[in-house]
Amino acid sequence: MQNFLYLLIFVIFSFSLQAQEKPRYIFPVKPDSGKIVLSGNLGEIRPNHFHCGLDIVEKEGEPIFAIYKGFVSRIKVSSYGYGNVVYITHPETDHVSVYAHLSDFSPKLRRYITAKQYEQESFEVEIFPSPDELPIETKELIGFMGNTGNSFGSHLHFEIRTIADFVLNPQDFFKIQTDNLPPKLFQVAVTPLSPESRVEGKYQSFRSNVFGTPKGWRVAKPISAYGLVGLEGITWDVAEGTRSSFATSKARLRVDGKEIFSFHITNFPIYEVYALNLHINYKLSRQTGSNFQRFYQTEGNRLGIYKGNGKIMVEDGKEYQIELDLEDTHGNFRTLELTLQGKKPKETQTNDLISSGILSYDIDENTLIIKARYIPPKTGNIEIVLENNQSLTVPMAYTEKQQAVFLYDLRKGKPKIIRTKNIELPFRKKMIPSGRNFLYEDYFMKVFFQNGALADTAYLDFSSKTTHFTIGKIAEPLVWDAEITYNHKANTILDLKKAFLRHERGKEFFKELNDSTFSVKTAYLPGDFRITRDEIPPFVRLVRKTPEKLVFQIGDDNSGISHFKAYLNGKFLLMEYEHKNALLWTDPRTTEPLTGDFELQVFDKMGNMQVYKTIL
């Protein structure tokens, strides 16, 4: 009986170990030998999103292999985004591997894809094969390294996700390169997190350089603070043998030796990738052009990579020793040391309103920052009248550059009027609550924010004209799109059947258009949206013509290229497109001779068509 129990324990323990073992994946590039060079890794800060995988650098045409057996579950061919991309589902491990920017696919996949392209009469296709259509073995060729889509150099963008589309760190599965270099830290900031908070006497982020120490870095002198504050920093990782920079994957924050916060950038949902703008101090990053990562949690951040909230409560007269570990995926780390000294701000005592020449305000999350260019004497209060006509007196917080600064917590009530002794300023912003669906509506437009679109309460301006409208200003970015429905009945200037919205960050196209309204979904907030009409067709220019190949340059300066179709003797002819150089060419794998009547139709996103015809 005793031997049986020992055997049972051994079997259970063995199964437990096997369950904890990482899958034996092969590397997708040069799996048997060869030096691997990375130019990017998981968690790098990119515009508005985290980078979700590895960028592996090699010459164009390098074979790409499946890391494990499974089946092709998704294929997309596009000139944008991931370009030519293959998704392989691995049922045994509940993972999905992703291979993007391929120059071409393996012969097996190419035959399948080309058949679908001719079936749909389209270069761009997105296909979801059933599990039995395209089975894949470990180390099977699936394609070749390339530069398709939004790529600016030959490389493979490689990801590992869970079946539920959570992004994993591929470097946890492979020993890719030797690296003994720790992350770098370039600057730190301490930021006030409540209207009562101060850093170096002010309600604004205080930035400081760091100097090197045997442990890592140190801030030269103590930073005075009071109230709830957060630590931020500019950091990235480096590696031996490459000039590329990488993500600092882990951070741990301690106050007086006690850990209060950490993050590990892995295992986050792909659909929350844009929460990157909550991981960084979005406002400070826009002001400085540098990405200050937050070492504390913020409202609405659903990435799930954090432990603890990291916010530090600083009391008057107390001193706090702060340590921050920054670590890369290879376990190399260094530690920042700094001291916070608690210093309560002085209070101004007066019953009088301040006299001011100029009165203005800004909003930082839920804090209203009011600045009054004072007329001596510089002491005094301001009055805030709320929407319910309640009157509040707000004392001066501090002065800077001939201005008195006042701070008000907007969670106490929405202002209607801000008043000094000689100026009255209306508060015109609309409050958009987070955590629930909300609809803003005026004569010209409706703006719908779904639950989760905003990380925190927002205060926005809305302005509408017949040919444009403005939504601004927002301190934190949208996490998800907002839906705008615009009443265009008063617009007698433009025919909207061939119109779109132009924004400084991009273009938005009508999701719905009827006799009275149009609607769009957008993440381009804040900003000015202008209704723009496009009746000009794309241009088409023949670049090269041989018996084996046709090459065209195509383009559209307004709404942009939508799609194209080519026909040879009345039959669909597959062509390939690369938007980066605006070139369109006949499929190099076509075996039929290019002779007879040729017609190329190129459409823009407003439906304008340009036709090129010739006899080959």
Task: Please name every model-derived segment.
Residues 4-13:
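Sec-dependent N-terminal signal peptides
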Residues 19-96, 103-108, 124-132, 137-138, ...:
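Surface-exposed, glycine-biased beta-strand/turn segments
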Residues 137, 178, 193-196, 201-345, ...:
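Long, low-complexity serine/threonine/glycine- and acidic-rich segments characteristic of extracellular
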Residues 225-230, 362-369, 477-483, 544-551:
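Short coil/turn motif common to extracellular beta-sandwich-like domains
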Residues 232-236, 368-375, 485-489, 549-557:
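Short edge beta-strand/loop segments characteristic of extracellular beta-sandwich folds
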Residues 332-349, 421-442, 612-616:
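Short beta-strand elements
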Residues 410-418, 518-537:
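C-terminal beta-strand-rich structural cap/linker in extracellular carbohydrate-active enzymes
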Residues 434-435, 454-502:
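Proteolytic processing hotspots in large secreted/extracellular or virion-associated proteins
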